[in-house]
A protein has these predicted regions:
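Long, low-complexity intrinsically disordered regions enriched in acidic and polar residues
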Residues: 1-412
Length: 412
């Protein structure tokens, strides 16, 4: 993908924006203080904390950059102002599947977002505030952040399509990191090297075990790449860009591996989401089929690719496509095998938008579950159909890979 393609929002992501919160019955991104027990408590706490006009607290770390007004965007850092909060857990999606939505809301809405507007090219020569934001983004451990607030606090929480939500926000006139920042040495070296491309830096850091969440954060903060190419990248774009970069890297490896010799089904459920991964004995091909129980009158969303991958953005499933594909490719590469993959993702009525991470982490959890083996595609799909709540026929009516695989079987 190129950044110019990333502002596009998938059709399923537009569906997510209509999701009604089960707590208050309103659209999640239009939360009301009068009804939300989580947010009301958070807002009351921050109102007391802001009596001095400044805030001090630990950041997981977390930085955010919006896309509105691009190429001049709002960006900043987040800190937690509630006592007893595990700052590290606030930005650790790999640990969130075991939490309830109530717990996740309580965690994420306790993050205060201090923001300022920046031209995206200012990443190349940052001023004092942006430099502090970039410094916090580099840290691999929680850091203490101090903000001086100007103007009123925006009471409405921030629910995004791909990024995890945050609590109240306000404009800051000053922001600084208190104490030392802990960053991997090689990351610091690549940040200082303005002759290495972002894709080269991402590839090397991923090979060294740096995860996609850290990579998306430093990429969003404009800390990777050649000097002339560095810019602030809206957080939701950076998440998908990193998922796509890593997926393409892994795909180049997977295409050279041996093909599996059986049909396998993996499954997992958490947080009102269920995933079923069907691996088939074929060269690489991939399809994501996503259905919403809240919108049964609408057809499932679908995107796919064949052996050489995609050359255009996945317009139906959006960022979810790249998140799920990354987890599947990572699994195949780690096992030294190649396969085709058809992934069914079902979203229950209780879900509210908490970010694209759940596609990545739930797929990863499913693939680590052991799975079941079947003798044919029809047997595998029959099992998946018995576990889905939306009729299998609705998913298959949108699938391109299932009829293709069946036609190849008949030819063989």
């Amino acid at each position: 993908l190129v950044l110019a393609e990333l502002p596009a929002v998938g059709r399923t992501e537009r569906t997510a924006e209509r999701v009604v919160c089960p707590v208050c019955g309103n659209v999640a991104r239009f939360c009301k203080l009068s009804k939300c027990p989580y947010y009301r408590g958070v807002y009351e706490a921050i109102s007391r904390s802001l009596s001095s006009g400044s805030l001090f607290g630990p950041s997981p770390p977390a930085v955010l950059f919006g896309e509105w007004g691009y190429p001049k965007v709002y960006g900043g850092a987040c800190l937690s102002f509630l006592e007893g909060v595990n700052a590290w857990l606030l930005e650790s999606p790999s640990r969130w599947l075991t939490l309830s939505i109530d717990d996740l809301l309580s965690l994420r809405l306790a993050l205060f977002f201090g923001r300022l507007r920046f031209p995206v090219v200012s990443a190349r020569r940052p001023g004092k505030v942006l430099e502090a934001i970039q410094e916090s983004a580099l840290s691999s451990l929680p850091v203490d952040v101090e903000m001086k607030i100007v103007g009123s606090v925006k009471a409405r929480p921030g629910f995004g399509v791909r990024a995890s939500p945050h609590g109240p926000s306000a404009r800051v006139e000053d922001l600084r990191v208190v104490g030392n920042v802990s960053a991997p040495r090689r990351v610091e070296q690549l940040v200082s090297d303005v002759d290495v491309s972002a894709s080269e830096a991402v590839a090397e850091l991923h090979a060294r075990g740096v995860d996609e969440y850290y990579l998306a954060r430093v990429f969003s903060a404009g800390l990777l790449g050649r000097r002339a190419d560095r810019r602030l990248v809206p957080t939701e774009w950076s998440i998908t860009a990193i998922d796509d970069m890593l997926g393409r890297m892994l795909l180049r490896r997977v295409r050279d591996l041996r093909v599996i010799d059986e049909y396998r089904v993996f499954e997992a459920s958490a947080l009102f989401n269920s995933v079923f991964v069907v691996l088939v004995p074929s060269v690489w091909m991939f399809e994501l089929l996503e259905g919403w129980l809240r919108f049964l009158d609408e057809s499932p969303y679908a995107d796919y690719e064949f052996y050489w991958g995609r050359s255009s953005y996945a317009e139906s499933t959006g960022g979810a496509y790249y998140a799920v594909r990354l987890s599947v490719l990572r699994y195949l590469a780690s096992r030294g095998v190649q396969a085709g993959a058809i992934v069914f993702f079902e979203v229950d009525r209780g879900w509210i938008p908490l970010g694209v991470w759940r596609f990545r982490e739930l797929t990863r959890a499913a693939l680590e579950s052991g799975g079941r083996r079947f003798d044919s595609l029809d047997e595998a799909l029959s099992y998946v159909g018995s576990r889905l709540r939306i009729p299998l026929s609705k998913y298959l009516s949108r699938s391109r890979l299932v009829p293709f695989i069946r036609s190849q079987s008949r030819l063989a």
